Amino acid sequence: MKRIPSIRERNIVLIGFMGVGKTSVGEQLAKRLFRDFIDVDQEIEKTWKMKISDIFRLKGEEAFRKIEREMTIDYCTNTSLKVISLGGGAYMQDAIRTACLDHCIVIYLDLSWSLWKERLNVLIDNRPVLQDKKVEEMEQLFTKRQPTYQKNSFQVETDGREVAEIVSYLEEVIKLGWEIYGS
């Protein structure tokens, strides 16, 4: 039987809508906690040797979600001491959500719709889920995903906070959790 990692060894998984800063926060948090950082979307791009948008276009969303699910579950169940950034839609998959909750510490980076919308111009080209969508449709997707992100995760409001501030806060909270809940 496989040993369940201690609270200190568990991977830390960052979830939230696309473009909220999971990769930026994750990279810095991993450095602060002396862990490896994994961006699942980047790992998928390396594996398939193409951009996510090209995978969606050439292989379809279903093929993308399948490899996303396989990789994420593998990272969650077979590794430890990592900070893992999930793509915005990954946590919507039941199998991924279960693996994250069973084996990792899940942190939801929350950004308000109004501030997210301000980032739209820099996001739209690299986010296939947003292609050909009206702003109203994007808002519906944003709103639809919120309850799933919020359920069973530690929520961090990111509005008006710089990455360094978010990382410092998370480092403090995580280390406090380690102290309270033991090794």
Curated annotation (Swiss-Prot):
This is Shikimate kinase. PANTHER family: SHIKIMATE KINASE (PTHR21087), SHIKIMATE KINASE 1, CHLOROPLASTIC (PTHR21087:SF16). Its cofactor is Mg(2+). The gene is aroK. Monomer. It catalyses: shikimate + ATP = 3-phosphoshikimate + ADP + H(+). GO terms for biological process: amino acid biosynthetic process; aromatic amino acid family biosynthetic process; chorismate biosynthetic process. Pathway: Metabolic intermediate biosynthesis; chorismate biosynthesis; chorismate from D-erythrose 4-phosphate and phosphoenolpyruvate: step 5/7.
